[in-house]
A protein has these predicted regions:
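Compositionally biased terminal segments of proteins
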Residues: 1-182
Length: 182
């Protein structure tokens, strides 16, 4: 629809800017789940950059005369949200989730809405969705997205084990993953 074509042009702008600066970045969350699993319509595109890079991205966009919103935690610009930390806090537990060198080593280049974007690995997208774990009762699709990714992807289980350790999530998430068939 119209929203997706608007986002497409904006995503192309962001992709070219970040790549020109050789920044490390990746599409994450819903848009990545769309690429790896069920093709739900894309409402917006979430991007993860390395820790501390948000001010750099703000400056790059402002140099292009883009009016961005930045609250210190995330950048919002025309359907694109940029984060540098997606650490999850649930039920008093903290699951660290940042674009570290391990996650960066698993990035892949794929087409999304006409732009050749970098995307977090299916393992990283899956673990984020499972850790968030929100369902329809919260108006979210985390577990449905997780199931879709599992149906359509093969996983590097060694890498998944490493990421679970980094997230301090092995005990919490392994049973959920097993129930989902991983």
């Amino acid at each position: 629809g119209a929203a997706m074509s608007l986002i497409a042009g904006n995503l192309g702008v962001v992709q070219r800017l970040l790549d020109a600066q050789q920044l490390t970045w990746g599409i994450c969350a819903g848009a990545a789940a769309h690429l790896y699993g069920d093709r739900r319509p894309i409402q917006d595109v979430d991007l993860l950059v390395t820790t501390g890079q948000l001010p750099t991205v703000v400056k790059l966009l402002q140099q292009q005369q883009k009016a961005v919103q930045f609250d210190g935690q995330r950048i919002l610009w025309r359907g694109i949200k940029v984060f540098d930390d997606l650490t999850i806090r649930r039920n008093g537990v903290v699951y660290p989730y940042t674009l570290d060198s391990l996650m960066a080593s698993q990035l892949r280049r794929m087409p999304l809405l006409g732009a050749m974007v970098l995307v977090l690995s299916p393992e990283d997208v899956l673990l984020h969705k499972v850790a968030m774990g929100r369902g329809a009762e919260e108006g979210k699709h985390d577990l449905a997205d997780a199931a879709g990714i599992i149906r359509r992807q093969k996983f590097d289980l060694d890498y998944m084990r490493q990421r679970l350790q980094v997230m301090n999530a092995t005990a919490a998430l392994k049973p959920i993953l097993a129930n989902l068939g991983v």
